[in-house]
């Protein structure tokens, strides 16, 4: 007695069952880390979530999660600035920096505040501005507990505790804790220079030779 061949439909059903079971196993494996990954291309996101940084710089040993980020970083060591501004010729390591720079020439301000409508060239400037409306002050001084809306303001404030004065006057050597104080101080020297110059001109003029009226002879002012 010859056994009948299995129908094609039954064969397909069996293969579909195996495929479904494999899919379930894969799904369980993909949920191992507490998240569902639909596509294999999402592996890079999983790696970043686990703080895995396999791409290491040979110059400074800094690590990165993506090879493209390492490639951009290595330009700092090589000094290669391949992204050049067509308007002024200034060059940059990254294309994103060039895009931000180009807004100086174009005047473009794509980041707009929803509260007051003021626009900004960079997203970081918008974030800082929005703290005016929200009152957020995320930067706190460890010494006195005072809070600030910008990190630069905290750095300036901390100098009141440390006594650091990194801004030095090139004319007299006096140091200041803030660049704005140095600029204000430099105005004193700029005002002094014209006064000294005018004084020298006056002294020179008093010693220039002049003609005595009616004598036809030269005389020097202040000399007999």
Swiss-Prot record:
Modified residues (Phosphoserine): 49
Disulfide bonds: none
Residues found modified as N6-acetyllysine: 18, 23
Keywords: Acetylation, DNA-binding, Metal-binding, Nucleus, Phosphoprotein, Repeat, Transcription, Transcription regulation, Zinc, Zinc-finger
InterPro entries: Znf_C2H2_sf, Znf_C2H2_type
Region (Disordered): 1-34
Expressed in which tissues: In the embryo, expressed in developing craniofacial structures including dental epithelium of maxillary molar tooth organs, tongue epithelium and muscle, and craniofacial bone osteoblasts. In the adult, expressed in mesoderm-derived tissues such as skeletal muscle, heart, kidney and liver. Intermediate expression in spleen, thymus and brain. Low levels in endoderm-derived tissues such as intestine and colon.
Subcellular location: Nucleus
Zn finger spans (C2H2-type): 55-77, 83-105, 111-133, 139-161, 167-189
Entry function: Binds DNA through the consensus sequence 5'-CAATG-3'. May be involved in transcriptional regulation and may play a role in tooth formation.
Name this protein carries in UniProt: Zinc finger protein 22
Originating organism: Homo sapiens (Human)
Top-level taxonomy: Eukaryota, Metazoa, Chordata, Craniata, Vertebrata
Gene: ZNF22
């Amino acid at each position: 007695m010859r056994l009948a061949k299995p129908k094609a439909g039954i064969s397909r059903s069996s293969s579909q069952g195996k495929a479904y079971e494999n899919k379930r196993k894969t799904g369980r494996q993909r949920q191992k880390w507490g998240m569902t990954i639909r596509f294999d291309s999402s592996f890079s996101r999983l790696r970043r979530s686990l703080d895995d940084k396999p791409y290491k710089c040979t110059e400074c040993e800094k690590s990165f999660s993506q090879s493209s980020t390492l490639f951009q970083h290595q330009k700092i060591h090589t000094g290669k600035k391949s992204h050049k501004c067509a308007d002024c010729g200034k060059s940059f390591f990254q294309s994103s920096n060039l895009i931000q720079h180009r807004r100086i020439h174009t005047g473009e301000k794509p980041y707009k505040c929803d509260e007051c409508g003021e626009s900004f060239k960079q997203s970081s400037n918008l974030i800082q501005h929005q703290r005016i409306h929200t009152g957020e002050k995320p930067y706190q001084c460890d010494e006195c507990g005072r809070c600030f809306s910008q990190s630069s303001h905290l750095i300036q404030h901390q100098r009141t505790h440390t006594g650091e004065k990194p801004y030095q006057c090139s004319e007299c050597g006096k140091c200041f804790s803030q660049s704005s104080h140095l600029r204000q101080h430099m105005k004193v020297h700029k005002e002094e220079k014209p006064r000294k110059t005018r004084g020298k001109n006056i002294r020179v003029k008093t010693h220039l030779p002049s003609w005595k009226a009616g004598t036809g002879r030269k005389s020097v002012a202040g000399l007999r």
